[in-house]
């Protein structure tokens, strides 16, 4: 399944070369534009199936699925549908109207939450989301990411007491594409 996912990433034109500023603030000569992939039903089904199977193999038990907006929302939604587990959406900032929530969906103390993300570089966005879940007394039982850029996310996430499970490492992706990230 990993090879199939890498093929879809490559065929979807997700790897872009040029000069980019990433969410982390880092500059990069390549960008993984996963949005074209996560708007593809076939890819979303595959990603959800992979996360479901990997989490089962690892013995990770969870009650709810969560993802930070925007990129992780389609992934979390697909996984919620695949597993029949309720969905949580972590907002980038508190709503300034209505309820002012940071989390959309029902969350209760003690909920075991599987967090998903599209791409990680330093892990800042997903760490923030995990901390918001912890503030609501939920337990983050694991973090799955579609592509890890291998630029410190795993180490930073583990320093915060969470575990990262990448479906694809960027080094494997570039090798499969037959290109260099330099």
Curated annotation (Swiss-Prot):
GO biological process, one term: 'de novo' UMP biosynthetic process
Cofactor section: Mg(2+)
Keywords recorded for this protein, A-Z: Glycosyltransferase, Magnesium, Pyrimidine biosynthesis, Transferase
Keyword Transferase recorded: yes
Signal peptide boundaries: none
One Pfam family per UniProt: Pribosyltran
Residues the record lists as binding orotate: 121, 149
Pathway this chain belongs to: Pyrimidine metabolism; UMP biosynthesis via de novo pathway; UMP from orotate: step 1/2
UniProt-recorded Gene Ontology molecular function terms: magnesium ion binding; orotate phosphoribosyltransferase activity
Catalytic activity: orotidine 5'-phosphate + diphosphate = orotate + 5-phospho-alpha-D-ribose 1-diphosphate
Domain of life (superkingdom): Archaea
E.C. code: 2.4.2.10
Binding site for 5-phospho-alpha-D-ribose 1-diphosphate: 91-92, 95, 97, 117-125
Assembly mode: Homodimer.
Function summary: Catalyzes the transfer of a ribosyl phosphate group from 5-phosphoribose 1-diphosphate to orotate, leading to the formation of orotidine monophosphate (OMP).
Family classification: Belongs to the purine/pyrimidine phosphoribosyltransferase family. PyrE subfamily.
Name of the featured protein: Orotate phosphoribosyltransferase
Species the sequence originates in: Pyrococcus abyssi
Highest classification ranks of the organism: Archaea, Methanobacteriati, Methanobacteriota, Thermococci, Thermococcales
Gene name of this polypeptide: pyrE
């Amino acid at each position: 399944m990993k090879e199939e996912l890498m093929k879809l990433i490559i065929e979807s034109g997700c790897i872009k070369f040029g000069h980019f500023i990433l969410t982390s603030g880092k500059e990069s000569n390549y960008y993984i534009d996963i949005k074209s992939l996560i708007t593809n039903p076939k890819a979303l089904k595959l990603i959800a199936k992979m996360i479901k199977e990997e989490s089962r193999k690892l013995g990770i038990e969870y009650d709810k699925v969560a993802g930070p907006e925007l990129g992780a929302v389609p992934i979390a939604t697909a996984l919620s549908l695949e597993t029949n587990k309720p969905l949580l959406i972590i907002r980038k900032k508190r709503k300034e109207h209505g309820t002012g929530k940071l989390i959309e969906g029902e969350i209760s103390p003690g909920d075991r939450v599987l967090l998903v993300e599209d791409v990680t570089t330093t892990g800042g966005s997903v760490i923030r989301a995990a901390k918001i879940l912890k503030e609501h007394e939920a337990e983050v039982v694991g973090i799955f990411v579609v592509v890890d850029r291998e630029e410190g996310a795993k180490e930073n996430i583990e320093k915060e007491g969470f575990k990262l499970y990448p479906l694809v490492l960027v080094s494997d992706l570039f090798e499969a594409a037959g290109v260099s990230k330099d």
